[in-house]
Protein backbone atom coordinates (compact mmCIF):
# COMPACT_ATOMS: atom_id res chain seq x y z
CA UNK A 1 0.00 0.00 0.00
CA UNK A 2 2.26 2.73 -1.21
CA UNK A 3 1.40 6.09 -2.69
CA UNK A 4 -1.69 4.48 -4.20
CA UNK A 5 -3.62 6.21 -1.46
CA UNK A 6 -2.22 9.61 -2.52
CA UNK A 7 -4.91 11.38 -4.45
CA UNK A 8 -5.84 13.06 -7.61
CA UNK A 9 -8.41 15.78 -8.23
CA UNK A 10 -11.34 16.64 -6.03
CA UNK A 11 -11.55 13.46 -4.11
CA UNK A 12 -8.82 12.10 -2.30
CA UNK A 13 -5.00 10.19 -0.37
CA UNK A 14 -3.02 9.93 1.81
CA UNK A 15 3.49 12.36 11.87
CA UNK A 16 6.03 12.44 15.28
CA UNK A 17 4.26 14.31 17.84
CA UNK A 18 1.88 12.32 19.95
CA UNK A 19 3.26 9.16 21.38
CA UNK A 20 0.14 8.47 23.38
CA UNK A 21 -3.53 7.78 23.20
CA UNK A 22 -5.96 10.57 24.00
CA UNK A 23 -8.85 8.68 22.46
CA UNK A 24 -12.06 8.07 24.37
CA UNK A 25 -13.53 4.60 24.30
CA UNK A 26 -16.15 4.13 21.57
CA UNK A 27 -18.45 1.21 21.12
CA UNK A 28 -18.69 -0.11 17.56
CA UNK A 29 -21.69 1.59 15.96
CA UNK A 30 -24.24 -0.90 14.74
CA UNK A 31 -25.44 1.11 11.77
CA UNK A 32 -25.68 4.55 10.22
CA UNK A 33 -29.34 4.93 11.13
CA UNK A 34 -28.75 7.58 13.78
CA UNK A 35 -27.46 10.11 11.26
CA UNK A 36 -30.43 9.68 8.96
CA UNK A 37 -32.65 11.78 11.19
CA UNK A 38 -30.21 14.69 11.03
CA UNK A 39 -30.11 16.85 7.93
CA UNK A 40 -26.50 17.97 7.66
CA UNK A 41 -27.09 19.67 4.32
CA UNK A 42 -27.99 22.95 6.00
CA UNK A 43 -24.71 22.91 7.92
CA UNK A 44 -22.20 21.58 5.37
CA UNK A 45 -23.97 22.45 2.12
CA UNK A 46 -24.35 20.09 -0.79
CA UNK A 47 -20.72 19.01 -1.01
CA UNK A 48 -21.20 15.22 -1.16
CA UNK A 49 -17.97 14.25 0.58
CA UNK A 50 -18.43 16.64 3.52
CA UNK A 51 -22.00 15.43 3.85
CA UNK A 52 -21.05 11.75 3.76
CA UNK A 53 -18.22 12.31 6.24
CA UNK A 54 -20.47 14.24 8.63
CA UNK A 55 -23.02 11.44 8.65
CA UNK A 56 -20.34 8.83 9.25
CA UNK A 57 -18.75 10.81 12.09
CA UNK A 58 -22.15 11.46 13.63
CA UNK A 59 -22.72 7.73 13.96
CA UNK A 60 -19.14 7.09 15.06
CA UNK A 61 -19.36 9.53 17.97
CA UNK A 62 -22.48 7.97 19.47
CA UNK A 63 -21.57 6.31 22.75
CA UNK A 64 -24.99 5.17 23.95
CA UNK A 65 -28.72 5.71 23.70
CA UNK A 66 -31.02 7.49 26.11
CA UNK A 67 -33.90 5.66 27.76
CA UNK A 68 -36.09 7.12 25.05
CA UNK A 69 -33.85 5.58 22.41
CA UNK A 70 -32.23 8.86 21.36
CA UNK A 71 -28.54 8.75 20.43
CA UNK A 72 -26.13 10.36 22.89
CA UNK A 73 -22.79 11.56 21.56
CA UNK A 74 -19.46 11.91 23.32
CA UNK A 75 -19.30 14.54 26.04
CA UNK A 76 -16.83 16.90 24.38
CA UNK A 77 -19.17 17.79 21.52
CA UNK A 78 -22.23 18.21 23.73
CA UNK A 79 -20.81 21.27 25.49
CA UNK A 80 -20.00 23.46 22.47
CA UNK A 81 -22.20 26.17 20.99
CA UNK A 82 -24.71 24.43 18.76
CA UNK A 83 -24.01 21.03 20.27
CA UNK A 84 -22.65 17.93 18.58
CA UNK A 85 -24.29 18.58 15.24
CA UNK A 86 -22.53 21.93 14.91
CA UNK A 87 -19.14 20.48 15.85
CA UNK A 88 -19.48 17.45 13.59
CA UNK A 89 -20.63 19.55 10.64
CA UNK A 90 -17.87 22.13 11.08
CA UNK A 91 -15.06 19.63 11.56
CA UNK A 92 -16.29 17.50 8.65
CA UNK A 93 -16.21 20.52 6.38
CA UNK A 94 -12.76 21.59 7.63
CA UNK A 95 -11.37 18.08 7.23
CA UNK A 96 -12.72 17.78 3.69
CA UNK A 97 -11.50 21.21 2.59
CA UNK A 98 -8.01 20.92 4.07
CA UNK A 99 -7.63 17.31 2.90
CA UNK A 100 -8.60 18.10 -0.67
CA UNK A 101 -6.13 21.00 -0.77
CA UNK A 102 -3.41 18.69 0.53
CA UNK A 103 -4.43 15.82 -1.81
CA UNK A 104 -5.15 13.56 1.13
CA UNK A 105 -8.22 11.37 1.55
CA UNK A 106 -10.64 13.16 3.94
CA UNK A 107 -11.64 9.80 5.42
CA UNK A 108 -8.02 9.07 6.24
CA UNK A 109 -7.65 12.49 7.87
CA UNK A 110 -10.80 11.87 9.90
CA UNK A 111 -9.49 8.44 10.89
CA UNK A 112 -6.24 9.98 12.14
CA UNK A 113 -8.21 12.57 14.14
CA UNK A 114 -10.45 9.90 15.66
CA UNK A 115 -7.49 7.72 16.53
CA UNK A 116 -5.50 10.61 17.99
CA UNK A 117 -8.14 12.52 19.94
CA UNK A 118 -11.60 11.05 19.44
CA UNK A 119 -12.14 14.22 17.36
CA UNK A 120 -11.86 16.26 20.54
CA UNK A 121 -10.03 19.56 19.89
CA UNK A 122 -9.28 19.94 23.61
CA UNK A 123 -7.73 16.50 24.09
CA UNK A 124 -4.27 16.62 25.68
CA UNK A 125 -1.84 13.73 25.63
CA UNK A 126 0.64 12.94 28.44
CA UNK A 127 3.38 14.59 26.36
CA UNK A 128 1.31 17.75 25.85
CA UNK A 129 0.12 17.13 22.30
CA UNK A 130 -3.11 19.00 21.50
CA UNK A 131 -5.80 19.42 18.88
CA UNK A 132 -7.79 16.90 16.89
CA UNK A 133 -4.61 15.52 15.30
CA UNK A 134 -2.51 15.91 18.48
CA UNK A 135 0.39 18.18 17.56
CA UNK A 136 3.33 18.30 19.93
CA UNK A 137 4.05 21.89 21.08
CA UNK A 138 7.80 21.19 20.88
CA UNK A 139 7.70 20.21 17.23
CA UNK A 140 5.10 20.95 14.53
CA UNK A 141 2.72 22.46 17.07
CA UNK A 142 5.11 25.25 18.04
CA UNK A 143 3.98 27.27 15.00
CA UNK A 144 0.24 26.72 15.56
CA UNK A 145 -1.45 29.25 17.90
CA UNK A 146 -4.08 26.79 19.12
CA UNK A 147 -1.34 24.49 20.34
CA UNK A 148 0.97 26.92 22.12
CA UNK A 149 -1.25 29.88 23.07
CA UNK A 150 -3.50 29.15 26.06
CA UNK A 151 -5.62 32.31 25.85
CA UNK A 152 -6.18 31.79 22.13
CA UNK A 153 -7.14 28.18 22.78
CA UNK A 154 -9.60 29.25 25.46
CA UNK A 155 -11.27 31.67 23.05
CA UNK A 156 -11.58 28.90 20.47
CA UNK A 157 -12.76 26.15 22.79
CA UNK A 158 -16.52 26.76 22.66
CA UNK A 159 -16.69 27.42 18.95
CA UNK A 160 -17.99 24.51 16.86
CA UNK A 161 -14.75 24.24 14.88
CA UNK A 162 -12.51 25.26 17.80
CA UNK A 163 -10.04 26.92 15.37
CA UNK A 164 -8.95 23.51 14.10
CA UNK A 165 -8.28 24.45 10.47
CA UNK A 166 -4.71 25.47 11.30
CA UNK A 167 -4.25 22.33 13.38
CA UNK A 168 -5.47 20.01 10.62
CA UNK A 169 -3.38 21.80 8.00
CA UNK A 170 -0.24 21.42 10.12
CA UNK A 171 -1.05 17.78 10.86
CA UNK A 172 -1.55 16.97 7.19
CA UNK A 173 1.71 18.70 6.32
CA UNK A 174 3.47 16.55 8.88
CA UNK A 175 1.74 13.39 7.66
CA UNK A 176 2.68 14.00 4.02
CA UNK A 177 6.27 14.75 5.01
CA UNK A 178 6.33 11.50 7.00
CA UNK A 179 5.03 9.47 4.05
CA UNK A 180 7.71 11.01 1.83
CA UNK A 181 10.41 10.36 4.43
CA UNK A 182 9.29 6.74 4.67
CA UNK A 183 9.62 6.08 0.95
CA UNK A 184 6.03 6.84 -0.02
CA UNK A 185 4.62 4.06 2.15
CA UNK A 186 1.38 5.15 3.82
CA UNK A 187 1.55 2.65 6.67
CA UNK A 188 5.14 3.57 7.45
CA UNK A 189 4.23 7.26 7.22
CA UNK A 190 1.47 6.73 9.75
CA UNK A 191 3.90 4.86 12.00
CA UNK A 192 6.28 7.83 11.84
CA UNK A 193 3.43 10.25 12.55
CA UNK A 194 2.80 8.42 15.81
CA UNK A 195 6.27 7.39 16.89
CA UNK A 196 8.92 9.18 14.83
CA UNK A 197 10.03 5.88 13.28
CA UNK A 198 9.03 4.51 9.88
CA UNK A 199 9.33 0.88 10.95
CA UNK A 200 7.64 1.14 14.34
CA UNK A 201 5.28 -1.83 14.75
CA UNK A 202 2.86 -0.76 17.47
CA UNK A 203 -0.45 -1.26 15.70
CA UNK A 204 -1.06 2.45 15.18
CA UNK A 205 -1.05 2.46 11.38
CA UNK A 206 -3.33 -0.54 11.10
CA UNK A 207 -5.74 0.98 13.63
CA UNK A 208 -5.94 4.22 11.61
CA UNK A 209 -6.60 2.34 8.37
CA UNK A 210 -9.18 0.18 10.15
CA UNK A 211 -10.89 3.35 11.41
CA UNK A 212 -10.90 4.74 7.87
CA UNK A 213 -12.62 1.60 6.56
CA UNK A 214 -15.20 1.87 9.33
CA UNK A 215 -15.96 5.48 8.42
CA UNK A 216 -16.29 4.53 4.77
CA UNK A 217 -18.78 1.79 5.64
CA UNK A 218 -20.84 4.20 7.71
CA UNK A 219 -20.71 6.88 5.02
CA UNK A 220 -21.81 4.49 2.30
CA UNK A 221 -24.64 3.22 4.47
CA UNK A 222 -25.91 6.76 5.03
CA UNK A 223 -25.19 8.10 1.53
CA UNK A 224 -28.57 7.13 0.04
CA UNK A 225 -27.60 7.86 -3.52
CA UNK A 226 -25.34 10.83 -2.83
CA UNK A 227 -22.54 11.50 -5.29
CA UNK A 228 -19.63 11.20 -2.86
CA UNK A 229 -16.63 9.38 -4.27
CA UNK A 230 -15.12 6.74 -2.02
CA UNK A 231 -11.68 5.19 -2.44
CA UNK A 232 -11.61 1.73 -0.92
Located regions from the model:
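Catalytic glycan-binding domains that act on GlcNAc-containing polysaccharides
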Residues: 24-26, 37-232
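Sec-dependent N-terminal signal peptides
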Residues: 1-20
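Boundary at the C-terminal end of the N-terminal hydrophobic targeting segment
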Residues: 20-24, 32-34
